[in-house]
Amino acid sequence: MNFLRSTAATLLDKYTPVSHTSTFRNTGQITPEEFVAAGDYLTFKFPSWSWADADSPSKRLTFLPAGKQFLVTRHVPCHRRLNNDFAGDAGHEEALVEGNKGGDDDDGWLRTGSMTSSQPLRVREVRNIDDAGNVGDREVVDEDDIPDMEDDDDDEAIIRAEGDNSNSGKRTYTLYITYANAYKCPRMYMSGYLANGQPLPPHLMMEDIVGDYKDKTVTLEDFPFFSHSVKMASVHPCRHASVMKTLLDRADAALKLRREKMKAGQGSGSEQGMEGLVDEINKLDVSGAHANAVEAAPGEDAEWEEVPHDVTDQEVAIRVDQYLVVFLKFIASVTPGIEHDFTMGV
């Protein structure tokens, strides 16, 4: 299924008529020329990003310049898995639940998850389980009776397995930004590596994707610019334009409000340069943007907060060449474990 989807996406990008008319402010979509301009801005301001070419001329998109087929950044750190670090208390506490008939303890079942809302955690009251699995009576353990682990000498003869590093420890990612002509917006591809430098198996990349996106808007597909097959995690661009338009509109509304406060003497001007832009982008609310975009019917504007429509071109908060900076802010909400800020150090 992923192969068919990847092939169809490649054909769509190649054979969909190319639009050179800018609708950036109205739709959130960009033209190939605007994509190149945004890529030039990104590589100039953030040198960790660079342009790259397809492996062969046959893999190139004809509407993009040779040598500027896609953007790439490497060695982006990812220190934690979302299934462990974004689960709250789930998985860290367990409770023995009695069976429906009120039988013995071994008739019950083990419930994992937080108990903080159901009962207080009594750390000094424990129940012993013997080798046969029988649960003993409750007993209160005195803290003085608990042995100190530091008092025990390590047995040097013990052979400790190194374990599987695939879902623990530091990973790194190579990130790619391509232009999706069928949707007239950027598309992100991600290729992961283990701490030892070995390629991360594609299915394990899903551990670094927010749960709501797994197998829905994030799929495993071949990277279209390589001659050989390389599976990567890719964020499908079907809703990118609507999400981007929302973020741009919110930024414009915030700029208008800030300028009105400045005129009234109630505020001060924002920072200038890249520091100011990154700071403003970090204030944008991305969490609900994608969900609302999905709910909006095709061809209709998503219903966000009321945005003033009298913002002139001279008052836009984010220019089209700064588009990819905002795009990376959105992608960071999909993969919060990957340190995208590492690629955008000011």
UniProtKB/Swiss-Prot annotation:
The keyword Protein transport applies. The keyword Aminoacyl-tRNA synthetase does not apply. Keywords: Autophagy, Cytoplasm, Protein transport, Transport, Ubl conjugation pathway. Pfam families: Autophagy_act_C. Residues 84-158 are annotated as: Flexible region. InterPro entries: Atg3/Atg10 (IPR007135). It is found in: Cytoplasm. It comes from the Eukaryota. Residues 242-322 are annotated as: Handle region. One of its GO terms (molecular function) is Atg8-family ligase activity. Its main location: cytoplasm. GO terms for biological process: autophagosome assembly; autophagy of mitochondrion; glycophagy; piecemeal microautophagy of the nucleus; protein targeting to membrane; protein transport. Belongs to the ATG3 family. E2 conjugating enzyme required for the cytoplasm to vacuole transport (Cvt) and autophagy. Required for selective autophagic degradation of the nucleus (nucleophagy) as well as for mitophagy which contributes to regulate mitochondrial quantity and quality by eliminating the mitochondria to a basal level to fulfill cellular energy requirements and preventing excess ROS production. Responsible for the E2-like covalent binding of phosphatidylethanolamine to the C-terminal Gly of ATG8. Monomer. Interacts with ATG8 through an intermediate thioester bond between Cys-238 and the C-terminal Gly of ATG8. Interacts with the C-terminal region of the E1-like ATG7 enzyme. Also interacts with the ATG12-ATG5 conjugate. The N-terminal region is involved in phosphatidylethanolamine-binding and is required for ATG8-PE conjugation. The flexible region (FR) is required for ATG7-binding. This is Autophagy-related protein 3.
